[in-house]
Amino acid sequence: MGLTISSLFSRLFGKKQMRILMVGLDAAGKTTILYKLKLGEIVTTIPTIGFNVETVEYKNICFTVWDVGGQDKIRPLWRHYFQNTQGLIFVVDSNDRERIQEGAAVLQKMLLEDELQDAVLLLFANKQDLPNAMAISEMTDKLGLQSLRNRTWYVQATCATQGTGLYEGLDWLSNELSKR
C-alpha cells in the first residue's frame, strides 16, 4: 500500500527523467534549439565538435538532451550516445535542398541501429521561416518517413531562432514517452 501511494505521489508531483539524443547534419540548428529550450534565448553558436548536454525541464518532465555535432567526420561517434536513448530528435534544415538526401541516408542508417529500436522519433523541420523552406509533406517524402515500420514518429515545423514549434514538438515527445 505504501508503495502504491508513493508511486502515485511521484507520478503526480515527481519529475520523470527522459534521455533524448538530438542529431542531424551540421548547420541544421541543433545547438540553437537546445539553448532556446534551455535558456529561452538565442545564443551565438559555433559548429559543435563533440557534444553539448543540458537538462531541459518542461511539463513535469526532465529531458536530458544530448546535442551531438553533425559534421560527417563526427557522425560515426553518434553510436556512443545511443544506449538508453528513449527519444531521438533529428533536426533537418528545411531550406537545405541540396543535402536532404544526405540527411535521409544518415537518418535511415541510424534507425537501423539495435540500440535505437525502441526510441521514438521527433523530426524538427527547422528554418521554416526561410522563403525556400520545404513543406512538411515534401520533407516527409524526401526523408522516406512513410516507409518506417514499427517506429513512432512525428514531424514538427520549427524555427529555432523564433522558438516556433519547439514546445509543440516537446509536447508530442512527452506524450509519447509517458505512454511507455
From Swiss-Prot:
NCBIfam families: small_GTP. It comes from the Eukaryota. It is found in: Golgi apparatus; Membrane. GTP binds at residues 24-31, 67-71, 126-129. The keyword Membrane applies. It is a lipid-anchor. GO terms for cellular component: cytoplasm; cytosol; dendritic spine; glutamatergic synapse; Golgi apparatus; Golgi membrane; plasma membrane; ruffle membrane. GTP-binding protein that functions as an allosteric activator of the cholera toxin catalytic subunit, an ADP-ribosyltransferase. Involved in protein trafficking; may modulate vesicle budding and uncoating within the Golgi apparatus. Part of the ciliary targeting complex containing Rab11, ASAP1, Rabin8/RAB3IP, RAB11FIP3 and ARF4, which direct preciliary vesicle trafficking to mother centriole and ciliogenesis initiation. GO terms for molecular function: epidermal growth factor receptor binding; GTP binding; GTPase activity; NAD+-protein-arginine ADP-ribosyltransferase activity; phospholipase D activator activity. Pfam families: Arf (PF00025). The modification Phosphoserine is found at S147. GO terms for biological process: apical protein localization; cell migration; dendritic spine development; epidermal growth factor receptor signaling pathway; establishment or maintenance of epithelial cell apical/basal polarity; intracellular protein transport; learning; negative regulation of apoptotic process. Forms a complex containing RAB11A, ASAP1, RAB3IP, RAP11FIP3 and ARF4; the complex promotes preciliary trafficking; the complex binds to RHO in photoreceptor cells and promotes RHO ciliary transport. This is ADP-ribosylation factor 4. Belongs to the small GTPase superfamily. Arf family. Transmembrane segments: none annotated. The keyword Coiled coil does not apply. Keywords: ER-Golgi transport, Golgi apparatus, GTP-binding, Lipoprotein, Membrane, Myristate, Nucleotide-binding, Phosphoprotein, Protein transport, Transport. PROSITE patterns: ARF. Its main location: Golgi. A lipid is attached at G2 (N-myristoyl glycine).
